[in-house]
């Protein structure tokens, strides 16, 4: 089933776990701080009884959803064919601070690598192989992407601005795109 750390969890470390066939979120945290997730494997989820309004959780919901947190690091993890991989900051108004993703491998993932809303995010040295929408910035998210490697990915960067949600931005430095695309 996976698990969620809720409200005021602090100094959490999750490591060396493998998540498969989860119907909802595999590993999530809400309103917590100092969260370190590393050396984990996230395989495709499975929900045979998706009765939600969204009707898109047949492959599970988020592998790693982090909402309203501060000081989150996700490192040395492997994501295999996950659908909604990682949502950071799920609100239009609640600011989340200081998220870092480094040395992760995204293999054949569909979207949210991660999707960020109201987040300051630093990403470096991640590898994306045959993925869909990768870094997706919305609602005042600020992303620094350094030395990422994208291979065979269809949309490496996506920025969605809205007058009601604020302007997001992605700054990419040293990223390499091989047989990959991005939307301006």
Segments and roles (model prediction):
Residues 139:
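A short beta-strand motif that forms part of the nucleic acid-binding face
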Residues 10-21, 33-53, 62-63, 68-90, ...:
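Right-handed parallel beta-helix
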Residues 1-28, 182-183:
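N-terminal carbohydrate-binding/catalytic regions of secreted carbohydrate-active enzymes
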Residues 166-167, 182-184:
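Outer-membrane beta-barrel pore domains
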Residues 26-30, 35, 157, 162:
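Helix-rich interaction surfaces within compact, conserved domain-sized segments
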